[in-house]
Amino acid sequence: MHSAPPLPLISLATTGRLDAPPLAARAALLEAPATPASFAAALGRFRDLFEQVEVAPPPAPRPAPDAPVRIAFWNVERCKHVEASARLLGGLDAAACLLCELDVGMARSGQAHTPRELARRLGAGAAFAVEFLELGLGDAKEREWHAGKVNRAGLHGAAILSPHALDRPAVIRLESGGGWFDGARGERRVGGRIALAATLRIAGIPTTLASVHLESHSDPAGRAAQMRILLGALDAYAPGQPALIGGDFNTCTIDRAWARGTGRRPVLDLERLLDPVPFEPLFEVLSGHGYHWRPCNVPGVPTQRTRPDGTPPPPLGKIDWFFARGLSASAPATVPAVDAGGRAISDHEVLVVTVAPDPAAR
C-alpha cells in the first residue's frame, strides 16, 4: 500500500491542541475498503493531525541547563500506568525525557491524554506528535481486554517532556506507506513511523533531541533505510548542531514481519541479541553520519522487559539505544521499568545518559 500522497518529511507546525477525528469518522474508515485509495483519502482528510506538533510549555520554565545534563529515553508501551510512570521518570532528574508509544484517548490506557498527564505530574512542558490514528482498540489482547469499549480520540505517538523551554519542535515522518492500514499486522491504523525532534540549549549551545520509533514489522535493511531518512532529516532540521537520538530501533537482527507471519521464532544466541551491531546495518549508517553509541549505552544488558502476562518471553534483546553526535556521553544506565511493587509497567526499560557539548567536535 504505497499510493498515498506523501506528507512532508519535516513539519515545524505547532498547535496548542490536536483535534482527533470524531468517532463517526473513525468508524467510517473501518467500514471503507482497506485500499491504497482509502488510506490516501484518510491521510488527506486528517492531514493537520499528522503535520502538527501539540505543544504545552512548562508551567514554570526552568533556566536553560548547564552541562552536563541527564537525558532519558523510554518506550512507555501505551503509557497504561501514568502514576507509576511519572514516579519513575520523576526520580531520574532528567533535563528531558524522550518518549514513544504514548496514547491519547485510548480505552487501553484509560482514555487519558498520557503525555499531558505525565507532564503535569512532572511539572514539565510537553511536545507531542501523532504516529498513528488508531481505528481499533489495539492488539489482540487489548481487543479482548477492552471489548465493547470505544476510543475517545484514538491517537498514539511520541513526546518530549522537559521542565526547560524547548525550541523548534518538529515531527519527522519516516514513512507513510500505509503498512498498518489493512490490518494485516494485527491492528488497523492510519499513519506511519515518526521521529519527534526539538532543540534544547545545553550550556548555551543549541542541541537537537530526537525521540524515535522504527518499524517493528521490518528487517535490518528496512531499519537502515528508515535510519537514513531520519539522519537526513535531522541534518536538514539543524545542520551541524550537536544531537542526541533516543529510540526504540527494534534491532532484533531478524525480519520480524516474517517471524510473526509464520508464527516461528528463530533461535538466536544471547550474544547476538545483546550486541546486534554486526547484524544491523543501521549502525554503519549512523557511524557514517558521525554518531557514536558505545559511551551512551550499557553494554550487554537487554532493554526489553517481560510483562506480567509473560510476554515477551526470554531471551530478551537490546533494541533501545542512544546515539550522539557532537556530544560527550557518560554514565549510561538501564533503569528497570517497574512500579513500587516491582511489577512491570512497560515491556521496555528506561535508558538514561549524561551528555555535554563536546568542544572537540566544534
Predicted ranges, named:
Residues 4-18, 26, 32-59, 103-205:
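Structured beta-strand-rich core segments of catalytic domains in phosphoester-bond hydrolases
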Residues 165-170, 207, 328-331, 360-362:
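Short helix-loop capping/hinge motifs at secondary-structure junctions, enriched
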Residues 189, 207-216:
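Active-site-proximal loop/helix segment associated with metal-binding centers of metalloenzymes
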